[in-house]
Amino acid sequence: SITSNTASSGGGVCVGDGTFTMNGGTISGNTVTNCGGGVTITGKSGKFTVSGTLTITGNKEGTTENNVYLTGDKINIGEDGLTQDARIGISTLGGQLQFATGANNDALDYARIFIPEATKQGYVVIRDTDGNLFLTEHQHNWTYALKEGTTDTIIATCDATDCPITDVV
């Protein structure tokens, strides 16, 4: 466990151009004033290899959840892969990006493992056919229908499986 640290960035772990490998374990309860409450990768060639059942949650930038701070494709899922119980909060400088490679286990729900900390802005995790993971804005697929039992109320429902909106509009 890496816990209860305070820093300007990378409260738990700060990596420049090296590689940090984490096979299980926990990084939590760390606080920063800048970015990467749990882990930050600052260098252009820096990488973070993850596998097993690991947890990187509960780290903060001030009072805001900020666990693994990414500026690009920095995470590699190791040969042993992740378990469905792994939880990794992810933050970015802003917007959409590819953040991981090696997500090749079709039995895993990577959107439950990697938790976008920008969910209020509608960001979700998606996987392409090559095993790359992306943090991207959710794309709604709206369907419209009359509300059952009425003739004047239309309901809208997003049919996309990763939709952050759970209420019928």
Say what each PLM segment does:
Residues S9, M22-N23, C35, G52, ...:
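Cysteine-rich, disulfide-stabilized extracellular repeat modules
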Residues G18, H138-V169:
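Thrombospondin type-1
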Residues S51-W142:
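Extracellular/surface-exposed low-complexity segments
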